[in-house]
Amino acid sequence: GKGLDWFKKQWGKLKNSFKKVGAKVKAAFNKGRDFLKKKGIKVDPLNCQGSKCRSCLIFTLKPKKFCVEYAFSASAITISLTKEKDDEAKVLLGPFTIKTGNIPQCSKLGSFIGELCLQGVEGRLKSSNGKPHVNLCVGLLLKKFGCGAKICVSYVDGKFSGSFKPKLFAGDEENGTIMEAGDKEDEGKVIDAVPE
C-alpha cells in the first residue's frame, strides 16, 4: 500500500553502502552465488502468529529441510532451529536469545550444515505521523555454502505489524559481522535491516 511505498523510500537511509572486499570474502561470495544460481536452497515465506514466526530452509539438492522459529520482542529475538525429517522435528539449536547489533553467534551444526551464524539487526524510522517504526531482521549465514537468508519483521508504535518475504543472499562473515554480497563480485556490505 501507500504506507509501504513511503517506507521503501525511507529505508534507503537504513541501507549500508557497498565496499570492496578481500579475496577470502570474494571467494565465499562467488561460492554462494553459484549455490544460489543452482537453486540449491529455498526459503519458505514467514508464517507468523502474533510475534512468533517460523520459516523453513529447504536444501533442494539433498533434499533436507531445516525450520527456524523466531519469537520477536522489541530489542531481542529468540531463535530455535529444528531439522524436519519424516515429519519429525529434531531440535538442533536453541531456543536462545540474540540481541540486535551484537556480533554474530556461530555454532557448528554437524557435517551437512556446517557452521551457522546468526545476527540480529534493527533499523528505526519515524512514520509520517511520527510513530516509531522498527524493522527487526535476523541474518542466518551458512558459512560452508557461502550464502544466507535475511528474515525481517516490522513493529509500528511498539506493536507487531507484519513480516517481509525472506531474502536469500550470497554472504560471509568478516570482522564480527555478516556481510551481504553486492552485484559486483568484489563488493559487499554489512548486513542491514532493509528487507529487500
Swiss-Prot record:
Please give the family membership noted in the entry.
Belongs to the redulysin-like family.
Source organism's superkingdom? Eukaryota
Location relative to the cell: Secreted
Q: Does the keyword Secreted apply?
A: yes
Q: State the name under which the record lists this protein.
A: Venom platylysin
Keyword Zinc part of the UniProt annotation: no
Q: Which UniProt keywords apply?
A: Secreted, Toxin
Tissue and organ expression note: Expressed by the venom gland.
Tell me, in one coarse class, where this protein mainly resides. Answer: secreted
Q: Which GO terms describe its molecular function?
A: toxin activity
